């Protein structure tokens, strides 16, 4: 019996040891090279309770980050720094859970793009359907089908907004809708609309004219503009199928991309004949005057920021919501401007009475007014400085080198017309990593010379106008006073009284043999037979 008891105890010990080792292997290792938390990686990405790590995206202009449940704090200094993480309030996860989210819901984590925070919703999430605006259920009189855009290729048309839409902190009251699946937001209409300053739910070589079912329509209810590309086909690959998607611009600055029909992966769409982009972009324009040609100006467009979304996430029944972040342009006073704790180094320019980071659509005004030289440290920014003092720009340690793309165009100083064909950006001249001074106007000396030239021209024109006006007044006076001394003076010296003159060329042959007074000849009339 003792032997059996010992054998039983030994067997039980072996079983317990095996069970312990099995449990240890399952929870400590799982699969080689993976932690047990990786099994719930999708839920962790959606609800990262205590994660502090930052996943850096390989794409430029943005970075990926995970949130925790600490109270929301403003990101210090510049958001362009890659190593920062932004927390969120504790009610974030509870709100999603109360809305009926489950473990099967796949929500892309928020992505900080400096100016916007984007969130991508997949087909399994109900928000993808909630964010889609059904235009067919809207008021018929407010839904407009653009006839030209629905029957042409590479066309764009202006659309006036019934509200002010904030885009990168600038308020827009009109946009330009293009057939290529994007909205152009620039004020200067040029031939390279696809280069920058766009809102692109899906920019590609769409041609609504190849199908009768293809339409471009929009709807404005006073608080939002919805632009929908319905059943549009790619011009260079019609057999891929039709695409249906929309972009919604809300009064509060939010931008929503909704996708209903995406027959293929966006990464498979060819960009040979037209750029393929999904995201946002903005730029500032610098105007250079050409001294040699007075009526021609050269415009250089600098792209200062871009939001590039992951094209692989764009599928059927998906959506993207982009929420604007605070910018320096929203502050109207020096104190709030320099003491702001947002993601930019805000500075106050007293000459313009404007708050700015130095990089927005008013860049040329900022530089021409000497604002970079005026800016001092935040402690002395709002103090009155002596006229002779030279200001220096002081920034925090989290500064980031700005990256630009440059588009240079030349145009005459006349009102431009809407181009009938909008080519791709193959001819766009791009310069990366430009210096700060490169974005400013570098022809101040030429402008001074041009200003002096224009002043002299204006004075000459005024003198000529005065001479002509005096001649007209003298003529009118002599006509009404023929017996005055001035009238008699000019009558006695009229051209018919001038002496005969001979004009000879250098060769000695006369051009005119003799010029005789008309009054000394007898008049005659030549009559012709009818």
Swiss-Prot record:
Subcellular localization(s) per the UniProt record: Membrane
General function of this protein: May play a role in tumor angiogenesis.
Stored SMART domains: PSI
Signal peptide coordinates: 1-30
Spans traversing the lipid bilayer: 456-476
Subunit record text: Interacts with CTTN.
Membrane topology of this protein: Single-pass type I membrane protein
Record organism: Mus musculus
Segments of skewed composition (Basic and acidic residues): 378-387
Alphabetized UniProt keyword annotations: Glycoprotein, Membrane, Phosphoprotein, Signal, Transmembrane, Transmembrane helix
Residues where Phosphoserine is found: 507
Family indicated by similarity: Belongs to the plexin family.
Residues bearing glycans: 103, 160
Chain intervals for the UniProt region annotation (Disordered): 378-399
Cellular component terms per the entry's GO annotation: collagen-containing extracellular matrix; plasma membrane
Primary localisation category: membrane
Stretches with biased composition (Low complexity): 390-399
Name of the featured protein: Plexin domain-containing protein 2
Extracellular face residues: 31-455
Domain PSI per the UniProt entry, residue ranges: 327-372
InterPro entries: Plexin_repeat, PLXDC, PSI
Cytoplasmic side stretches: 477-530
